[in-house]
Amino acid sequence: MIFNSSNQKFFFYNFPVFLFSLIPFFLITGPFLSDLAISLISLLFLIYCFKKKNFSYFKNKFFYIFLIFWVYLIINSLINNFNVDSLKISFFCVRYGIFVIAIVALLDTDNRFIKYFFYCIFICFLVLILDGFYQYFVGTNIL
């Protein structure tokens, strides 16, 4: 990923790295914030790819396999019972494949951010363990 300005670097690299690092904390709060972070990272990556006209990350056999699986999910939702909720869930599963490719692109740019992600996971586990001990001894939940 090549950036022309610091503003572009912030929106297409720093902000997604920040969101990715906060996903463990978002998972504690529930599914909304983590799904929002995944969707934002995927959307920003798609905007970057269309802006730079760089689709080389999508020319990958794993992404093609994921697309085949995604089409299978959609066809399965249509054939089985044509439930609109099932079709909606299957249709928006493509964001996970784009999210994985976005993380690979971020790792290609600079792989030091994975260290911050592991620090966030460590802090998250530490907070959960301390909350578990507090809940065991006092009887009330902090989180």
Where are these regions (language model features)?
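Hydrophobic core segments of transmembrane alpha-helices in multi-pass, intramembrane catalytic enzymes
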Residues: 34-45, 88-101, 135
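Small-residue-rich segments of transmembrane alpha-helices in multi-pass membrane proteins
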Residues: 68-70, 98-100, 123-127
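Transmembrane alpha-helices of multi-pass, membrane-embedded glycan-processing enzymes
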Residues: 95, 118-131
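Membrane-interface amphipathic/re-entrant loop segments adjacent to transmembrane helices
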Residues: 81, 85, 91, 140-141
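Transmembrane signal-anchor hairpin modules in multi-pass inner-membrane enzymes, especially those
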Residues: 1-84, 105, 111-115, 119-122
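Membrane-interfacial helix-loop-helix modules of multi-pass inner-membrane proteins that assemble, modify
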Residues: 77, 127-143
